[in-house]
A protein has these predicted regions:
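Positively charged, helix-rich recognition surfaces that bind polyanionic ligands
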Residues: 94-100, 109-338
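Acidic carboxylate diad motif detector
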Residues: 4-109, 240, 246
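N-terminal structural subdomain of ketosynthase/condensing enzymes
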Residues: 1-10, 175, 179
Length: 338
């Protein structure tokens, strides 16, 4: 087969040819990195760990360049890329030891914003022990509900404004002739509205998950099946289900869990996922009675056995906490009884 060495030789010939001579105007390093990625993609395909590599359209793909250590230099705290006389004008999002960078990736997103990411070695220090355990119920009305009664939500008003900007942008784009100058202006404006929306959500997710791992040592969550929760239905109730699906997806439950898990691992905390079929909302956290008649519309309910009045989500979070502690006590292979 054709491997990286073969394609690297082809690249040398392409750069010296009349038809593809423009390739010599840029550094060879990101071109070589693209060939390495191509080889990795085909290797993964032959190993049956991924599907057949697809052609990446210049219009639809995110523009990116990857530089290995030979393709950039760092001088006086500034980054110079190969074939560039001036350093990059960078607004750093965080402090890092740029001198230890082994790879630099430059990207331009669909909103026309340029980003640079550096692969550096960094030692993550464990967070102080707090001795606290919390159950976390991830939901729709309230994004995050804790067993101690706290409810954490993004700024819904700002979120709604961003959604309205996107709707206006979609309507404006639909009125333009595709690929015209005005269409491109409208597309860029819509992309920036999407970027503002997703950036705000990601910022809230990072701040919320960082708060949780700073405050608690053990975090108990449900193993939610988001794809199953957002499955489409036909017939009666289709419109209501579509609205529910949008609300679930807008809270980014899967990404929130992913962040919780890797940050817990980083900072020496424990994140426990309980069985997705555990009836956390239906079970009374005081006596264990299961209310089979509870519906999604019931935000509060009173236990018919012990008389305790419950906030649906806080009660679920308390049950998740108890179930998580049981999993820790019995081992990962334990299965909780309903």
């Amino acid at each position: 087969g054709v491997g990286y060495c073969d394609t690297a030789k082809m690249l040398t010939n392409w750069r010296s040819s009349e038809e593809l001579g423009f390739l010599s105007e840029v550094s060879v390093v990101p071109l070589q990195q693209s060939l390495r990625h191509l080889q990795s993609a085909f290797s993964n395909f032959w190993k049956k760990t991924s599907r057949y590599p697809r052609f990446k359209s210049r219009k639809k793909s995110v523009l990116s360049l990857e530089y290995s250590r030979s393709g950039f230099r760092i001088k006086n705290g500034e980054v110079y890329l190969a074939k560039m006389k001036e350093p990059l004008d960078i607004v750093w999002s965080r402090e890092c030891d740029i001198n230890s960078a082994s790879t630099i990736t430059v990207k331009c997103d669909k909103a026309g914003r340029w980003f640079i990411s550096l692969l550096c070695e960094s030692r993550v220090e464990e967070k102080p022990i707090t001795g606290k355990t919390v159950g976390i119920d991830l939901g729709v009305k309230d994004a995050v509900v804790l067993s101690d009664g706290k409810k954490l939500n993004p700024d819904r008003r700002a979120q709604k404004k961003n959604e309205e900007r996107i709707k206006r942008g979609q309507k404006a784009l639909a009125r333009k002739q595709k690929d015209s100058k005005n269409w491109e202006k409208a597309r860029l404006k819509l992309s920036r509205a999407y970027a503002r929306y997703t950036d705000a959500k990601r910022d809230w997710l990072h701040k919320t998950t960082t708060y949780l791992v700073n405050t608690y040592d053990v975090l108990c969550i449900e193993d939610l099946n988001v794809s199953g929760m957002t499955r489409k239905v036909s017939g009666e109730g289709r419109s209501a289900k579509s609205g529910l699906n949008r609300s679930i997806l807008s809270n980014n439950l899967s990404e929130l869990r992913f962040m919780l898990e890797y940050k817990s691992q980083w900072y020496g905390k424990e994140c426990v996922a309980i069985d997705r079929f555990f009836p956390s909302s239906q079970r009374c956290s005081e006596c264990g009675y299961i209310n089979q008649e509870l519906t999604l519309n019931d935000r509060h309910w009173t236990c018919s056995e012990c008389g305790t009045h419950h906030d649906r989500d806080i009660n679920a979070a308390k049950n998740i906490k108890a179930a998580g502690l049981a999993v820790i006590a019995c081992g990962d292979g334990a299965r909780l009884e309903s």
